[in-house]
């Protein structure tokens, strides 16, 4: 498939990224430096899209454009037909949940307190959380298998457990679109697999549209429905993992000799070739 994704019927599309570009200038006398050029893809409810590429390929810029934190220089990002950057912060937070690489605590908190922060977009003034908010937060913890962590202090749980709790806070926002920036960073292999399997299950069951930024080839290929392959700010290919994972293309992007094999499930598996 080419760098422009195949189009679905309009009624099926939740997220539409249409020829989006972004650039910045270090100073007014310099020509703009493009960090992302003419990128397009569409995603439906229940789908996982992986934005894949090496460092400085434009992955985080694209995620910020999708979230509405940045306005595109050209093109548009539509969520259910509405430009994401034109939504006010409260409306945006009710529709889009963003899980950053690092979630830092400003003060000590128990897990349940942290997850309840996801209900902030629905709060009214200085009122305390409602019974409904508490139930939604508890359900979010249950969805990620973290109910047993409810009363634990956030700084006293493992990295894998913390990522599940951070995901629960995002789910408590009841979003249509879930955006995650390198969610498996610093996790061991087992925790990575657990997190991606949870995301896949949640996307299917709750009809979330999920966009994950990653540089992990096998995680992207193993769990996503679509891959957007970026290189130096350009979208080189968009499509199902099996169509994107071409050896020559991946070697060009990642500057590494590798092999690509298709497993029994039709999912690609990448191995790095040793120099020896």
Feature names for model-found ranges:
Residues 67:
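Helix-to-loop junction immediately C-terminal to a conserved catalytic motif
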Residues 253-276:
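ABC ATPase nucleotide-binding domains
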Residues 178-182:
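Catalytic Walker B motif of ABC-type/P-loop ATPase nucleotide-binding domains
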Residues 153-157, 161:
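Conserved ABC ATPase signature
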Residues 52-54:
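The feature captures the beta-strand-to-loop junction immediately N-terminal to the Walker
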Residues 174:
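Conserved catalytic motifs of ABC-family nucleotide-binding domains
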Residues 75-83, 92:
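Conserved ABC transporter NBD signature motif
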